A protein has these predicted regions:
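Conserved mid-domain beta->alpha element of the FAD-binding
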Residues: 315-381
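Conserved N-terminal helical subregion
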Residues: 94-186
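N-terminal Rossmann-like FAD-binding beta1-loop-alpha1 element of flavoenzymes
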Residues: 6-33
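Conserved FAD/dinucleotide-binding core of flavoprotein oxidoreductases
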Residues: 261-311, 333-344, 356-359, 363
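Predominantly flavin-linked oxidoreductase catalytic cores and closely associated redox partners
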Residues: 148-292
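Long, low-complexity C-terminal extensions of enzymes
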Residues: 359-501
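Glycine-rich FAD pyrophosphate-binding loop
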Residues: 25-48
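Dinucleotide-binding Rossmann-like beta1-alpha1 core, especially the glycine-rich loop
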Residues: 47-133
Length: 501
């Protein structure tokens, strides 16, 4: 009789380590799977922040994490959207929000109604028909109303990275996950499988399955036969990230701010006790020496404390599962944080792994399915991030001119061409970003579709006009009913007591 996987060793650091360990234990512990965590030295600094997509909430529900307590512990703030500015010189900023997909009804996407109206003189932008965008502009949090209506939106988070990772570690400990800490001194292989790892203190750990959550170090995966990291250097010109802190904002916004400049972009992420400042840039345009001095000017905020610079290398492992070793998070797929997808990548890898968790400890044909899904998953996220650069309109700047001319993957080219023709997005398997996300991005970047779905013309004009007007009224009314960010996090009373509001 074939033997099942009994022990899983998760080797890594920070949030990815503890999310993976806790999720595997929660999902498979009752089936007899024992999880061991090996904690490597943290790469986080006090200034670091996790900016997340709404999908993280589903991971929290799986792990039984109380949202309010988590946000309070990690100085967290709900984020309804991202606001992009200066990606096209002279163009107005635009929002990317997280509206929920309506239930299937056979109707065409609302964006097609809007597009026809726009071509016939409608002067109201699509953002005003998005509940998430409306909430972001008003400083509101799109919470569930429970009325069963089609209009709903979700929100991501801004989280203090170190505190959040520590909270996950404590959760794993409470769930009975045994952990060790140190550095990897040796990895013992037999064929294409890991038999054991040894820590620098002499501790030896054996397991049936090893999960590499070590980030860019890929401490286990790069020991595996045939392991290769595929750089996306030709698509992404930024190779540095700098993080710092600024004072907390007097009134918490419902969005993060992403502003382009001559050599990259700078992001402002609201937290309760500070504002995280992150810039991603090309070191051949802006030097590491000059960037800390430029950061306050770019952020338009005084920066306090030390700014930390690190190298980034976007790309992915050609095979994130080899033998009995599986990479998750940044170890599998490395992205710059322009779309707040870092923890979503970790979550996506973990979810795919659990879905194809090996049935036996001796042979693991599930690796092929995982590798195929991860390539599709990574390619879709890469394409969305790349679209920001390819569609930029910052002309006569070497970095941005080069970004527009970058080689575009066929999957992205298909989306761009189809949208330019008829305002439609080709959504495939393993997509992270919805039709609405892509539509807001391309319209915000200045793409003007030549036409629209011809089926719209089969409907009488009067019902179309009423549908558009009703949607606009409903979004405006519902957004104003939502709580402000300060109300959501319970900060209103504190501000009033301090005489701030």
């Amino acid at each position: 009789m074939t033997r099942r996987v009994e022990t899983v060793a998760v080797v890594g650091r920070d949030a990815a380590l503890w999310l993976a360990a806790a999720a595997v234990q929660r999902s498979l512990g009752a089936a007899g799977v024992r999880v061991v965590a090996v904690e490597l030295p943290s790469w986080l600094n006090a200034v670091d922040c996790y900016s997340t997509l709404p999908s993280l909430a589903s991971m929290h529900r799986l792990l039984g994490i109380d949202e309010a307590k988590m946000l309070e512990a990690a100085s967290g703030v709900p984020v309804a959207a991202q606001r992009f500015s200066n990606w096209s010189k002279g163009a107005a900023p635009f929002f990317l929000a997280y509206d929920d997909e309506p239930p299937p009804s056979g109707d065409l996407p609302f964006s097609q109604y809007w597009l026809k109206g726009h071509k016939e003189g409608l002067r109201v932008g699509l953002e005003d028909f998005s509940l998430g965008c409306a909430c972001a502009k008003l400083g509101r949090v799109p919470v569930a109303t429970g009325d069963g209506g089609e209009l709903s939106a979700s929100y991501g988070y801004s989280l203090d990275a170190s505190i959040y990772a520590e909270a996950l570690k404590q959760l794993a400990s409470k769930r009975g996950i045994v952990s060790s800490s140190g550095k990897i001194a040796d990895v013992t292989l037999k064929g294409d499988c890991i038999r054991s790892i040894e820590l620098d203190d002499g501790t030896r750990i054996e397991a049936d399955l090893f999960i590499d959550a070590s980030g860019a170090e890929r401490v286990l995966m790069m020991k595996m036969p045939g392991a290769k990291f595929e750089r996306w250097k030709d698509q992404f010109g930024c190779d540095r990230i700098i993080t710092a802190s600024a004072a907390p904002l007097k009134s918490l916004p419902a969005f993060s701010q992403i502003s382009a400049f001559r050599g990259g972009w700078v992001g402002l992420y609201p937290l309760r006790d500070r504002t995280a400042v992150v810039a991603v840039y090309a070191s051949d345009v802006v030097s590491d020496h000059s960037m800390p001095g430029e950061l306050p000017l770019l952020a338009r905020m005084a920066v306090s404390g030390e700014a930390v610079v690190a190298e980034i290398k976007p790309g992915m492992l050609e095979r994130p599962w080899i033998g009995n070793c599986v990479a998750v998070g940044d170890a599998a797929i490395a992205l710059e944080p322009v779309d707040a997808a870092q923890l979503h990548v970790a979550q996506g890898c973990i979810s795919h792994l659990i879905a194809v968790f090996p049935a036996t400890a001796d042979e693991m044909p599930e690796a092929s399915a995982y590798n195929k899904s991860m390539r599709s998953f990574a390619g879709n996220i890469r394409d969305f991030a790349l679209a920001h650069y390819v569609l930029n309109r910052r002309f006569d700047e070497l970095f941005w001119d080069k970004a527009r001319e970058a080689e575009v993957p066929a999957t992205l080219r298909q989306k761009l061409d189809l949208f330019a023709a008829r305002g439609t997005v080709a959504i495939g398997d393993d997509e992270t970003f919805s039709d609405q996300n892509w539509t807001l991005l391309m319209l915000g970047a200045g793409v003007e579709p030549d036409g629209y779905d011809p089926r719209i013309d089969l409907l009488p004009d009067e019902p179309q006009i009423e549908k558009v007007q009703q949607r606009l009224r409903a979004v405006s009314q519902l957004a104003r009913q939502m709580p402000s960010v300060d109300q959501f996090v319970g900060r209103t009373e504190q501000l009033q007591a301090a005489g701030v509001v």
